[in-house]
């Protein structure tokens, strides 16, 4: 049997899908925004349930900052409603097409995670459709174990159908943004660990992976903060809350096929050098722009992944304790150079700890490396991944599960020792593995 897909329109239809799947002995994988690079919603001979049509905003208390949403609500639609009322959310990823249910299940993080933590900090409670067909109301107060298992749990335990969020007060939806040069890893560490004094809300560093050994760690830092400033027009605010259909006058397919022959390591190296040259030594120049433009700038470049066609790309994000960061980053970039797979994108963020069992978090810095697969055949790719895993374990790091589909179970268990708690919850709430994606089978099924 081939994989089937269902797109229920409401809770009743969702429950019917669950019952039909159980009667037909089909396992269920859950698809939200479809932005994960992992295999969390992929499955062979399964029923994939797409929750994107269960997308009502049920209530919004604009005075006190509470909102109740169904799990298929798109983040862009929610921000359009709450930000003009001076409310925001924390721990947002860079994809404007993320669904709230998927953000909960991945426990996303963002450029403000150093200050506010992961997306879980917004969550007061949620309703969970269990394998037995019952709906369980979950919160930190009612069931902390299930809360910590479902948040960041990649859909392993059930389907989140409704979420109550506590919003974050903001000065306005306007943000002041500035960049400065980072000359080495020492500069980078100093920047991230003096952020509390800066007044910033958001910050990240883009490293230049093509820099020489002497200037390894060179790059630019961007920091920004909410400000009381004259608001832009509604059209300017909403422009980046929706994925664009064209890049200029061109369809994305045409644009990227035109750019692709001229794009490679040399082009990326040049872009990094120009970006560094144009930046200031200090945060002396800034611009004031609407939050969506800063958060979702990539929405102006739809189907960005087509730049890597036809071979695709590989992304791995790993986090390390502060004291291990420089050595870990140095070795990761050295291995990339050894395999002639320098990342085209190399971003660093600071994080905070989180209590959820499978959440990508901790008191340290993460590095995301994104590189094309054109130069790596399957054999080289496996060797490269194994070397990366070795380095990450060596420096007590862990990998973001939503961005990598090749982590062996043995590596996963070392990086996420709370997997035992997840296994216990799985046996308690879904012993027949009704909810079972390729990721579930790879990471939680015994003898897989």
Question: Where are each of the predicted segments found?
Answer:
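Noncatalytic alpha-helical scaffold of FAD-dependent oxidoreductases
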Residues: 1-448
């Amino acid at each position: 049997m081939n994989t089937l897909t269902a797109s229920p329109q409401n809770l009743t239809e969702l429950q019917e899908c669950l019952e039909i799947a159980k009667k037909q002995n089909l396992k269920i994988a859950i698809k939200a925004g479809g932005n994960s690079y992992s295999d969390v919603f992929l499955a062979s001979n399964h029923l994939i349930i797409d929750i994107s049509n269960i997308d009502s905003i049920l209530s919004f208390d604009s005075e006190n900052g509470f909102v109740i949403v169904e799990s298929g609500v798109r983040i862009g639609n929610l921000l359009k409603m709450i930000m003009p009322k001076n409310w925001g959310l924390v721990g947002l990823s860079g994809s404007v097409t993320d669904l709230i249910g998927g953000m909960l299940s991945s426990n996303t993080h963002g450029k403000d995670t150093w200050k506010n933590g992961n997306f879980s900090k917004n969550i007061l409670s949620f309703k969970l459709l269990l394998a037995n067909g019952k709906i369980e109301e979950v919160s930190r107060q009612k069931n902390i174990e299930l809360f910590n298992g479902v948040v960041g749990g990649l859909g392993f335990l059930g389907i989140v159908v409704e979420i109550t969020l506590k919003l974050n007060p903001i000065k306005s939806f306007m943000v002041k943004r500035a960049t400065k040069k980072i000359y080495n890893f020492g500069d980078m560490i100093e920047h991230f660990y003096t952020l509390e004094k800066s007044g910033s809300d958001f910050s990240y560093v883009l490293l230049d992976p093509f820099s020489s050994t002497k200037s390894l760690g060179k790059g630019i830092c961007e920091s920004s903060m909410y400000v009381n400033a004259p608001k832009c027009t509604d059209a300017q605010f909403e422009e980046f809350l929706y994925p664009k259909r064209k890049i200029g006058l061109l369809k994305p397919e045409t644009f990227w096929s035109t750019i692709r022959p001229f794009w490679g390591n040399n082009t990326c190296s040049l872009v990094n050098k120009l970006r560094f040259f144009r930046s200031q030594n200090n945060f002396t120049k800034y611009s004031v722009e609407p939050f969506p433009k800063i958060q979702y700038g990539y929405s102006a470049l739809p189907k960005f992944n087509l730049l890597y066609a036809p071979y695709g790309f590989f992304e791995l994000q790993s986090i390390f304790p502060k004291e291990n960061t420089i050595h870990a980053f140095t070795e990761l970039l050295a291995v990339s150079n050894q395999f002639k797979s320098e990342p085209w994108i190399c971003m660093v963020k600071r994080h905070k700890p989180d209590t959820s069992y499978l959440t990508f978090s901790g008191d340290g810095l993460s590095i995301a490396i994104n590189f094309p697969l054109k130069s790596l055949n399957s054999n080289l790719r496996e060797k490269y991944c194994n070397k990366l895993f070795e380095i990450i374990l060596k420096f007590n790091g862990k990998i973001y599960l939503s961005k990598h589909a090749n982590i062996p179970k043995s590596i996963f268990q070392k990086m996420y020792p709370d997997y035992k708690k997840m296994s216990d919850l799985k046996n308690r709430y879904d012993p027949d593995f009704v909810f079972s994606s390729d990721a579930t089978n790879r990471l939680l099924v015994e003898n897989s």
